[in-house]
Structure formats: structure tokens, C-alpha cells
Design a protein with these regions (language model features):
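Low-complexity, Pro/Ser/Thr- and charge-rich linker/hinge segments at domain boundaries
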Residues: 25-28, 139-163
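N-terminal edge beta-strand
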Residues: 33-63, 151-169
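Short amphipathic, basic-aromatic surface patches that mediate peripheral association
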Residues: 70, 177-191
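Short, aromatic- and glycine-rich surface loops/edge beta-strands on solvent-exposed regions
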Residues: 80, 115-123, 231-241
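Aromatic sugar-binding surface patches on proteins
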Residues: 98-106, 215-226
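Surface-exposed, short loops/turns at beta-strand junctions within beta-sandwich domains
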Residues: 108-114, 226-231
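Short beta-strand edge segments in extracellular beta-sheet folds
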Residues: 134-140, 249
């Protein structure tokens, strides 16, 4: 076969096959499983522009900070998925930032053991850009009983939002904490009870960003987002029992 014919063959190879040929930088035995389950087997590339920042060791496995930054991909970001590969409940969040919200999320989550952490960013061309990190942990963060439920009066504080808005040069940083036990169903006798939906809205009720949360998120969840410009915003939340909460930010 001539060289020109060989080049033609490689040119006609499907895009997803070329992208999927990349080796996993963390060599995780669970990568292919989550590629199929979370990303539906769609084209991907491991991309250092997607920053996934976690501590090297989780001092408290029930409260592990994660910072996902996809600003290097600019306005091409459609959605961000984050998960901990060896957790009994791997998925942490699914974030659709919208045009007025920066593709950046900071949140706290639980880990059951040392695990690879992934954030996959879908861009407008249909390719997932995957950032990776790893956190070591003594373990037990997912199966530990809730601390919130031991505190008197936690039911009266359910859904209370504490936080603020911090002005920046090109926009605003929203930092908040929501009172909620975030029960994941792994503790005997306590069913799932967790915040599963959140939206950032403008004052007219238009949705600027959506965030789907999973039971891996820590109790009394903390969240940081960035909004472009200096418009007033509101946060709307709902848990899996249908309780709705709202707060001005």
C-alpha cells in the first residue's frame, strides 16, 4: 500500500477512536467503567487545562474540598461532570454553567477510601476534556453517620443558606453553605435524604446555571461559583423529598 493510501486510511478513522487511544494518566482500573457510565462512551481526551484540585490526603474523609477549574476552555464549555472513582456512590455533581457563569466549581464531598478524582468537561464540539487528580484517605467518609443529625434543632435549620457575594474585577464570587444532612442511604436505618438540584437565577427568575448534586456531597454542603458581571442573583435548591429552598445572594 502506498504512503498516500496509508495517510488516507488514518484520516478516515473515527474521531472517538483516535481520542480514546490516550492512556489514563492515573492508570485506574475503573476508568473505562466510568467512561461508559458517566460519559456514555463518548469521545474524550485527557486535558491538563481542566484543573482538579484536591488535598493529597483527606484529613476528614467526610469533608474533602474539590476545586474544578475549566476556565482555560473558555466559552466552549457545555457541562462539567465530577466523580470519585472508588466511592460506593461515585458521582459528585453535574454542572451546566450557562453563558453568564464561569466554568468553575468548589465543593466538599465524601470519600470512602483513597481514590482517583475526575472532572470531565464537555465542549461544544462534543468532546469530553478530562482532568484527573488523586486523594489519599484513611477511609470511612461515606459510611460514617451524620453529624448534623446529632445536633439539636437541625430540622428547624434545614435549608438555611449562609454565605455571601464577593465582588471581583470581572464578576462576583458566590460562596455559601446550606444546612442539610445529605444522607446517602449507606447508614443503617436512615434512607437517602439529600439536596439534588440547584439553580443560580437572576432577579427575574431566569436560570443562569444548573447544578445536579449526588449523595457523595458532604453534609451541610459548601459551594463556590463565579458569575460574570455584577448582577444580583438568587439560589434555588430542592432535595429528593421535594423540599424547596431559596436565598438571595
Amino acid at each position: 500500500m502506498r504512503v498516500r493510501d496509508l495517510l488516507l486510511v488514518f484520516t478516515l478513522l473515527p474521531l472517538d477512536g483516535v481520542l480514546a487511544a490516550q492512556p489514563d494518566p492515573l492508570q485506574s482500573v475503573m476508568w473505562e467503567y466510568h467512561h461508559e457510565r458517566v460519559l456514555n462512551g463518548e469521545p474524550y481526551v485527557f486535558d491538563d487545562r481542566v484543573k482538579v484540585l484536591v488535598p493529597p490526603f483527606a484529613e476528614d474523609a467526610r469533608q474533602v474540598p474539590m476545586h474544578v477549574d475549566a476556565r482555560a476552555l473558555g466559552d466552549e464549555v457545555v457541562r462539567i461532570e465530577a466523580w470519585a472513582e472508588l466511592n460506593p456512590i461515585p458521582r459528585v455533581f453535574s454542572f451546566v454553567p450557562g453563558e453568564q457563569v464561569v466554568p468553575l466549581v468548589a465543593i466538599r464531598f465524601r470519600v470512602e477510601q483513597a481514590t482517583p478524582i475526575r472532572a470531565a468537561v464537555l465542549t461544544r464540539d462534543g468532546v469530553w476534556h478530562v482532568g484527573s487528580s488523586r486523594v489519599d484517605a484513611a477511609g470511612g467518609g461515606c459510611s460514617a453517620p451524620s453529624v448534623v443529625r446529632t445536633q439539636p434543632g437541625w430540622e428547624q435549620r434545614l435549608g438555611r443558606v449562609v454565605g455571601g457575594r464577593f465582588e471581583r474585577a470581572a464578576g462576583s464570587r458566590l460562596r455559601l453553605q446550606v444546612s442539610h444532612p445529605m444522607d446517602n442511604g449507606l447508614v443503617g436505618g436512615i434512607p437517602e435524604f439529600f439536596l439534588n438540584q440547584a439553580e443560580v437565577r437572576d432577579t427575574e427568575g431566569n436560570t443562569l446555571a444548573t447544578l445536579e448534586l449526588y449523595p457523595a456531597v458532604s453534609e451541610n454542603p459548601t459551594l463556590s461559583l463565579e458569575v460574570k458581571g455584577h448582577q444580583d442573583t438568587r439560589l434555588w435548591l430542592r432535595d429528593n423529598n421535594g423540599n424547596e429552598f431559596e436565598a438571595a445572594l
